[in-house]
Amino acid sequence: MQVTQEKRPGSRVGLKIVVEADQVKRSYEKTLRQLERNIQIPGFRKGKAPRNLVIRQVGRERVMASAVDDLINEAIQQALKDTQLHPISRFELDDKVEQLLDRFNPEADFSFSGYVEVYPEARVGQYKGLTVTATRVTVKPEQIDQLIDRWRDQRATLLPVEDRPAQLGDVVVIDFQARDAEGNPLEEIAAQDFQLELKEENFIPGFVAGVVGMQLDQTKEITATFPDDYFRKELAGKTVTFTVCLKEIKTKELPELDDAFVQEISEFQTVAELREHLQKRLEQDALRQSEENLETAILNAILETTEVDLPETLVEQETTQLLARSLQSLQQQQGVTPGEIRKFLSQLPPETLNQLMERHRPEAINRLRRTLALSAIVRQEQIAVGPNELEVEVEEVMAAYAQQGQKLDRERVRQAVHEDLLANKVMAWLKSQTTVNWVDSEGNPTEPPTLSPRSEGEDRQERSESARAGVPETEFEAEKPEGSAIPEAVEPPVDAKAEGEVATEPQAALPSVEAEASGIPEAVEPSAEAATDPAGLQLEQAVAETPKAGKKSKKDK
């Protein structure tokens, strides 16, 4: 088999493939044998009918279509392997189905051409000798109290209230129904026994303020306006009227902050021990976040002089991954089940789903540009991961997951760990080439933090020690009420921390070994769909739909 490559516009690589006559004949015979085994002809046992009867039963056109389909798919698979291309899209044929069938001869060479989209190569400008400004993150004394208060709030006891109206901080149970400006009910914005904590940020602007002051069993109309950037475009900026019935009022009784409480939420024995541990953790997080600020500053500077043509296929794939990740985050943080997510998505109008995708598109493009820029620098500077350090890290990851009772595919772990290590190496190299001006959260010059080279293993060990100590690491998220009518959390959680302050969100205890690339795409395998039908031909179906001679299909007109 002969394969010729050519560069095409964008990120496309053209392939011209010539299959020799002997291989064509073998493929044709293989197709016929498969048909003979599977076709039942009256008067013959399956697999025993003469070939000419099988061809007559199936139809010569469909036999030829099946043979061409098998031949092309096999040839594409071999061509991709020989050329070591890693496509991000299926193989697209240059010729129409009719043209392929017209020139197919089981006794002669067979040629065809097409293209695949591959990862584009970024054209990186300046990345050595950069000067950047990065924000140093510091720990504020009140952050420890905020963390502890959050855990106390999470374990609060809800006590019924009957002698006063609802006030901020209460948890209420309500029924509500929304109506548009014309008074028409909005069926999708309604709920029964909806539990809501009265915080302004917990619902659309104006709603919580309207509930505050209501008495038990009172029904009230509340006017509220959806934000202009609300993910459902048909509601964005719209003012609606809610008919609200207040059914229950509950107040929170927080547990006392004492040694008993500390022992309940952690393996520490005293409040002092917990505070000491949290101080250390926050300082570690401050260093880590300072380093992330530096990395972001470097990457932003590099992207200013980076050019890359992103194929739409790649952007769509990354956007879909980001949406999936935000839904997974919703599942993990608020206890929403995969079934509930699927139900929610199935009920979304197509235009709403498209709007969600559009919200993630800018981030997807930015992530791809960063990834491809780093990949180009890795190639240019010949940065690599040593086999020994890779295996050591793989063993640590496998052991860490094994302790949690999880068994992972070693090759997937190796790929994920390799990507992490390579990303760490290229960032470490870039930092060594960069001059940094450190500032505080107010933008004033400050002393640089003490950033020491750290391995993923060291970070993971620290976080595992915290996990073993039983210290809660997640922000308190209000439990999602059953029957939530407006699932705003479909969007990824917004990082509300101001730059220069330590976030109190958790750091993942273990690296992800999902299929997503963590930084540098060295080898993207074809999708399972591409593996089984790389060209997406479905020639047999196409032949069945091919118009007879002398007629044109609507597609051809």
Swiss-Prot record:
> So what does this one do?
Involved in protein export. Acts as a chaperone by maintaining the newly synthesized protein in an open conformation. Functions as a peptidyl-prolyl cis-trans isomerase.
Q: What is known of its domains?
A: Consists of 3 domains; the N-terminus binds the ribosome, the middle domain has PPIase activity, while the C-terminus has intrinsic chaperone activity on its own.
**Pfam families from the entry?**
FKBP_C (PF00254), Trigger_C (PF05698), Trigger_N (PF05697)
Q: Show where the PPIase FKBP-type domain sits.
A: 169-255
Q: Where the protein is mainly located, per its record? A: cytoplasm
Q: Source species, please? A: Synechococcus sp. (strain JA-3-3Ab) (Cyanobacteria bacterium Yellowstone A-Prime)
- The name under which this protein is listed is Trigger factor
Here the disulfide bonds are none
NCBIfam families reported in the protein's UniProt record: tig
Specify residue ranges for compositional bias: Basic and acidic residues: 455-466
Q: What is the lineage of its organism?
A: Bacteria, Bacillati, Cyanobacteriota, Cyanophyceae, Synechococcales
Protein family (similarity comment): Belongs to the FKBP-type PPIase family. Tig subfamily.
For this UniProt entry, the molecular function terms from Gene Ontology, in alphabetical order, are: peptidyl-prolyl cis-trans isomerase activity; protein folding chaperone; ribosome binding
Q: Name one GO biological process term.
A: chaperone-mediated protein folding
Record's catalysed reaction(s): [protein]-peptidylproline (omega=180) = [protein]-peptidylproline (omega=0)
Quote the EC number: 5.2.1.8
